[in-house]
Amino acid sequence: MSKSSGKPGPDEDRLELLERSELLGYLAAGLAEAADGRGCMVLLGGEAGAGKTALLREFCGNDLSARVLWGACERLFTPRALGPFLDIAQPAGVELGRFAPNRRVPHEFAGALVAELANDFPTVLVVEDVHWADEGTLDVIKLLGRRIESLPVLAIVSFRDDQLTADGALRIVLGELAGTRAAVRRHLPPLSLEAVRMLAEPAGVDASRLFERTGGNPFFVTEALAAVDAD
């Protein structure tokens, strides 16, 4: 995936990427496996502001020698049916519209998507914010997760794990995928006090107090330090 020609401002996104090298390395290893035809699905959880999107942008912004397909769910009162896959379908070469009259849309589309992904070129497939997903999207994710092991695909599915409910559809899907060999659940933790200190001290901010106020949440840390800079 080619990088954007626009350049971020000073330290943009970087504040959220401290202590993320291990997970970036894990994703790189997963893509290497996928390139050899052994696909996997990474179920990436973390609270709001943990830096999931920043991490995925950093990973996909590298020269991966892979096709990148990116879709996202949106916070709507009526979620878009197969929302993230509407984003993915055209660049993936799948004509989603032809499945619309069929009630088995998720099953039909999942089959078409798997067929398209079963080629010799590796693919990184990102589906963001599935805590807002409709049931059809979750069905496609589940069906893909069951078949991904034989595909040259690294699928990364992100969600807010602090918004899971005991009887929610997403928790059920995550539980079912946990029983497959190719799906792995990973958690993106808050920053440690040491990481917050690395960011706070150059700005003359008390690190312990900032850590206590933000809980190490990268977004809150970033916003607090930006407010100091604005003053």
Which residue ranges define each predicted feature?
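Key residue(s) within conserved catalytic/signature motifs
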Residues: 1-231
